[in-house]
Each structure stands twice: as C-alpha cells, then as structure tokens.
From Swiss-Prot:
Lineage of the species this protein comes from: Viruses, Riboviria, Orthornavirae, Pisuviricota, Pisoniviricetes
Protein source organism: Porcine enteric sapovirus (isolate Swine/United States/Cowden/1980) (Sw/SV/Cowden/1980/US)
Domain free text: The N-terminus domain points away from the virion surface.
Keywords of this entry: Capsid decoration protein, Capsid protein, Host cytoplasm, Virion
Oligomeric and partner information: Homooligomer. The portal-like structure consists in 12 copies of VP2. Interacts with capsid protein VP1.
Protein name: Minor capsid protein VP2
Keyword match Thylakoid: no
Main localization category: virion
Pfam families, sorted: Calici_MSP
UniProt family annotation: Belongs to the sapovirus VP2 family.
GO cellular component assignments: host cell cytoplasm; viral capsid, decoration
Localization per Swiss-Prot or TrEMBL: Virion; Host cytoplasm
Function comment: Minor structural protein that forms a portal-like structure at a unique three-fold axis of symmetry, following binding to the host receptor. The channel formed by VP2 may allow the delivery of the viral genome through the host endosomal membrane.
InterPro entries the UniProt entry points to: Minor_structural_calicivir
Further details from the record: Translated by a ribosomal termination-reinitiation process from the bicistronic mRNA coding for VP1 and VP2.
Length: 164
C-alpha cells in the first residue's frame, strides 16, 4: 500500500505543479495584457498632448492675427477703413460736423458728407446777414439811426481831471 500512497502523493505533486505552472502562465498573460493596455494609454496621452499643443498653437496664431482678420472681414463686409479699424478694436474716433459718428457702412458715408456747394451756400447766407446784399444795402452794413443821442450821467464819474 505504501506504493499506492506514494503514487497518490506523486500524482498530487504533479497536479500542484501543473496548477502552479498554469498560475504562472496566467499571471504572465495578465501582465502582458496590462502592459499593452498601459502602452495604449501612454500612446493616447501622447496623441492628446500633441493635439492640445496643435490647438494651442492655432489659438495663438489666430489671436495674433485677430485684428487683421477682423479688419479684413469688416472691409469685405462693406465698412469703410475707419469703421473697420474700430470693429477690430481701435479706439479711433471719427467726428463729422462736430459730432462723433457711429460705425459707418461705405454706402452711408456718402450720404453723411457735406458737399462743398452746401458749405458755400451757408457762408453766403452768413455773409448776407453781416454785410447785406450788394446794390440793395450799404456796403458797410446797416445804416446807423440818425437822431439825438442821450447822455446818461454815470454815478461816481466826474468830468474834471484831478492830479494826484
């Protein structure tokens, strides 16, 4: 019977060895799977970092060229150069007739400008009021009224000169 007990112990040993070898193989496969998973995560992180860096570079390039892009877009949309610069962030101000004008489309600027003819007419009207019409009123303005002028005494004023 001892040889049966020895054979059983030998079979148990072989079963334990097979189980241990199976666990070692399984553990090695799990390590390989974890290693490939970690490598994939590292590669994804590298790709994400690369993409973030590209997006940051695009953002900086876009912001560096933003005023130029805004100006070009405004001009192509029909705004004049001053209004386009104002849209791009310029603090430039345009005054027309003593008033600050809002953003102006190129079609509106022509409507707002005064023609030289109107300015000359306005100057002629002011000149007519101050000088009169040639041939109708005297050239030196309106005549002074004729008549007696009243002398009004001023309190505290004397007519004699005193020497000090």
């Amino acid at each position: 019977m001892s040889w049966i007990a020895g054979a059983m112990q030998g079979a148990g040993l072989l079963g334990d060895l097979a189980g241990t070898i199976g666990q070692i193989v399984l553990h090695n496969k799990q390590l390989n799977i974890m290693n490939s998973f970690n490598q994939a995560q590292i590669q994804l992180a590298k790709d994400q970092l690369k993409q973030n860096q590209q997006l940051a570079n695009q953002y900086y390039e876009f912001n560096a060229n933003l005023p130029v892009n805004q100006y070009n877009s405004a001009v192509s949309a029909g705004f004049d150069s001053v209004s386009a610069r104002q849209l791009a962030g310029s603090r430039e101000v345009r005054y027309l007739g003593g008033q600050q004008t809002p953003l102006v489309h190129q079609g509106q600027i022509h409507q707002m400008m005064f023609s030289p003819k109107h300015l000359m007419q306005a100057q002629h009207v002011v000149g007519t009021f101050s000088r009169g019409m040639p041939g109708v009123t005297p050239s030196k303005g309106l005549p002074r009224p004729q008549g007696v002028t009243a002398k009004v005494p001023v309190a505290g004023a004397t007519t004699t000169h005193s020497k000090v």
